[in-house]
C-alpha cells in the first residue's frame, strides 16, 4: 500500500507542478529579486508553467531548459541573495577579484545562504529523479503551441511596447537592451547581465586605450608646498570603527593624536573598490556621470613634473586589468608586492615600507608623489593577522580580526610618518579608505561585506597630516570623494583649467551623491548600519 502511494505521488502531475513552482520561486530569488518577488509572481508562475509544459512535450527539451535555469541560478546565487540583480559593481568584482579574495568572499557568506543553497540543490535532485518517471505526450501539439505562444507574448509584450513608444530615430537598437524590458525575469536577468558585462568591458577598453593617449589636462601653474607627498589609499576601513571618530576600542591611536586635518564626514564614491576608485582618482564630467579616462591623479602629477611612484599591496590581476593597477603602471616607477594574480600570497602592507624608504632616499631634489595602495581590511580579515589571534574582541572572531586590521593600518601610517620625518624634508600625507562595509550575519557568524544599501558602506576616514602641522583641525561640513581629484590638485599646488578652484579642505554645504552600482543616488536616502559594540 505504501509503495502504491509513493508511486502515485511520484507520478502525480499536481505534485510535480508544485515542485516546479517552488523551483521557479527559488530560482527567481537566486537571480536577485530579493523581496521583490511579489512583483514577479507572474514570472514565477510562467517559468513553472514553461518547465511543466516542456516535460510534457519532450524530456530532452525539459532537461535543456531545467539545467540551464539551474546552472544560471546556482552560479549567481550568492550575489543574488546579497546584492540583488546584476550590476556593474557585481560584474567588476568578478573580473577584478583574485582567488584569495574569492575565498574570502565565500568564507564571509552567512550560513543562511548555504542553507538556501542546500535546499535548492536538494529540490533540483528531487525534480530530476521524479521527472524520470514522467512520460512525454507529443500528441497535444496544439496545447503546447498555445502555451509557448502565450509565454512568448508575455516575454515580448513589454519590450515591443517600449520599442513602439521610442520616438528617438537616432537611438541604436540593441538586443540586450530590448530583452531587458521583458516581464519574464530570467530573460530580463540574462539580457541585463549581457548589457552590464558589455558596459564593463567597454569601460575597461577605454581605460586601456587611455594609456596610449595624451591627457586632456591643461595646467595653469604649479606651486608645491612640500618636497614629498604621500597618498595612502586604504581598503574597507569604516569610519565608525576607528577610535579617530570615537569608537571606544583604541583601533587608531596614531590617527587620533597626530596633528592634521580630519574630515568629520568623508563619503566614498562607491561601495566597492572598482567603482569607487574610478570616480575618485579620475576626473569626472557631466555631473559625475562620465569619466575622462586619460585624466587621473598620476597623469596630472606627471604633467606637473612631479616624480611619481606607485607602491601596491593589492597586486595585479592578469595584465594590469584592475582599476588601481591601470593607474599604477602609469607612474614613473611602480612596485607591486604580488607579481601574479589569482594565486598571489597574503602579504602584509608593511612590505611597502622598505621600497618607500628607498624611493625617499634617492633623487632628493625631486618633488615626489608616492602612492601606497594597501590591502588594509580586505575580507577575509583574519587572514591578515599572519596566523596570530586578534588582540581586540568584538562579538565574532571575524569582527575581532577586523578591528585588528584597523590597528595594523594605523601602525603603518605611524611608521610612514616616522620614515618621512627621518628624511629631514618637508612632507604631507593624505590617507583615506576606498570604501566601507556593511554587516552580515549575527552572533559568532557576524562579519562584513560590500553592500550598496547602507551609509556606512560609503563612510570612510579621511585625514591629512603634514610636517608643518601644529594642531588638529576638524572639518565639519561633509565632503564627497567625487571631488577628490580637485582636492588632490589643490594639495599638490596645481591649478588646472578643468578643475574647481574652491577649497576642497573647507567645503561648503552640499548634497552628496554616491554611485550604488546602477546610478547616482542621494547619500542621505541610504539606510543605517551602525557599528557594533560589546554588550
Question: Which residues fall in each region the model found?
Answer:
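Active-site rim elements
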Residues: 33-34, 285-287, 397-406, 417-418, ...
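Active-site-proximal alpha/beta segments of enzymes that process anionic O-linked groups
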Residues: 158-232, 236-390, 459, 481-512, ...
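Histidine-centered active-site/metal-ligand motif
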Residues: 373, 378-379, 435, 446-449
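Metal-dependent active-site segment of extracytoplasmic phospho-/sulfohydrolases and closely related
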Residues: 230-231, 408-447, 489
